[in-house]
Amino acid sequence: MEALRISLNDYILSGGGANGESYVLKTDPAVMLKLYFPGKVRQPLDEMILARKVFEAGIPTPEPGDYVVTEDGRYGIRFNCIIGKKSYSRAVADDPGNLPRYAEEFAGMCLDLHATHVDTAKFENVKDRYYRLLAESPFFSTGEKDRIGRFISEVPDEDTAIHGDLQFSNAIFAGDKRYFIDLGDFCYGNHLFDVGMVYLCSNLSEDSFIRETFHMPKSLAVRFWRHFAGAYFGEDRSLRDIEEEVLPFAGLKTLIVERDMNQPMPNIRAALEPILR
């Protein structure tokens, strides 16, 4: 796919992140530009192609835009912003009195997502992703990798949608419309791989990380999880039972976090104890 050429002079810098920067069009603030740092050519194209497939699969996500390149050779994606949007993490931080409602709405979105059957020929199996991460990890012994691999293989298969990075900052709403965003890790498989991320972000992450990323103290994030868990799994299940089931899946995120941080992460790795013992 050939990139559409644009001039960065037409845009205003609005923010930055680990992979690049975001801009808004000077003449229309509803038009956003996600511009990757120099050298990243394939990543924005792959992200846009996947975003298009996810959108066409019926997942509630903003419609993807154009694959673009600037005069100096930086690649990115241009798309229309959702006006008046707010993430569920920001909503909880700004309005903790309505936390139960926000948690229930987010749980409803997740239940709908995890009930959506997808064409498995178009997306990656979540198990294959974790097998690959496991093989590449330098932080586990051969015996530990064998036990983790066995656990993954024994998880029941599902052909339903997986967000892949299910943080409650990656779900937004504007009025009565709700969307998932940042679906670069979208795949299919057992829903517990997704729910494990919700638990990790709210219960296993450090308070400082939660404050910086989700704009709230850890105590509030834990409250969100508890309301979410009841709405997602049903009030007839105890929180203890739910967390025992979800904990190993949160622990599997160790493979992603340690890859990104390039060091062991004991606070998250501890969640793998049910698998490794």
Describe the role of every protein-language-model region.
Residues 195-236, 249-266:
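Active-site activation/catalytic loop segments of kinase-like enzymes and analogous catalytic loops
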